[in-house]
């Protein structure tokens, strides 16, 4: 069994991004800018935003966080997004999800200018992904693909099972795998007999938010396991959706939690923001 080390790869990517930021600044005098909108006091969301800010600082991005109270109105968030859309110093806009229940999340995501949609959640970018065109891809599944590439794991022709059908992870993960010529199956909360599906899989990508959902008897020998889940166990420890200790014995590759997919998500946010900055710089030449 070999670990898919997202922490090590993300550090490599950060070094490359930092170098390219310097080059961009030297040639155009522009610095990539990321705006984050954080609504409410959710500790997990605040921790994620803080990690993103630190990563921006490490690579030399300009970043700003708009913190808003949980009882904020729809129009107040919309006004902030419009302001960021029109701000030439901002290349990427990130809406930290989930948003409070009174907010129409779909409308908010649709308001973000697609060329600044570094999370890849705008329907325009979702459409480009599903039709195999270049655009912004959600950071977590994009990070998974980069991690597989680093370890020279080719998904072409492989039976891939994606567990979880969210717009943020499951659906874009399936689209990326399909674009790379994998045979893809998506399982979700209504799937009957999950074990039957996972046992037939060469590769399992799980992002369902359920501790120990994937157990040893659900995985065939030599399978590749990508654990996208991140949960807080009763002990306070961060764990994924896979029973790591027991499943690791059976598989050929597996991502640890933490240190697997998580760091790659942030690395791809940096990569997407740099991509946006370069595109904006080209437009202004």
Curated annotation (Swiss-Prot):
PROSITE patterns: THF_DHG_CYH_2 (PS00767). The lineage of its organism: Bacteria, Pseudomonadati, Campylobacterota, Epsilonproteobacteria, Campylobacterales. Homodimer. NADP(+) binds at residues 164-166, 189, 230. It comes from the Bacteria. GO terms for biological process: L-histidine biosynthetic process; methionine biosynthetic process; purine nucleotide biosynthetic process; tetrahydrofolate interconversion. Keywords: Amino-acid biosynthesis, Histidine biosynthesis, Hydrolase, Methionine biosynthesis, Multifunctional enzyme, NADP, One-carbon metabolism, Oxidoreductase, Purine biosynthesis. It comes from Sulfurimonas denitrificans (strain ATCC 33889 / DSM 1251) (Thiomicrospira denitrificans (strain ATCC 33889 / DSM 1251)). The keyword Ribosomal protein does not apply. Belongs to the tetrahydrofolate dehydrogenase/cyclohydrolase family. NCBIfam families: PRK10792.1, PRK14183.1, PRK14186.1, PRK14191.1. The keyword Amino-acid biosynthesis applies. PANTHER family: C-1-TETRAHYDROFOLATE SYNTHASE, CYTOPLASMIC, C-1-TETRAHYDROFOLATE SYNTHASE, CYTOPLASMIC-RELATED. This is Bifunctional protein FolD. The gene is folD. Catalyzes the oxidation of 5,10-methylenetetrahydrofolate to 5,10-methenyltetrahydrofolate and then the hydrolysis of 5,10-methenyltetrahydrofolate to 10-formyltetrahydrofolate. It holds the Pfam family THF_DHG_CYH_C. One of its GO terms (molecular function) is methylenetetrahydrofolate dehydrogenase (NADP+) activity. Pathway: One-carbon metabolism; tetrahydrofolate interconversion. It catalyses: (6R)-5,10-methylene-5,6,7,8-tetrahydrofolate + NADP(+) = (6R)-5,10-methenyltetrahydrofolate + NADPH; (6R)-5,10-methenyltetrahydrofolate + H2O = (6R)-10-formyltetrahydrofolate + H(+). Its EC number is 1.5.1.5, 3.5.4.9. One of its GO terms (cellular component) is cytosol.
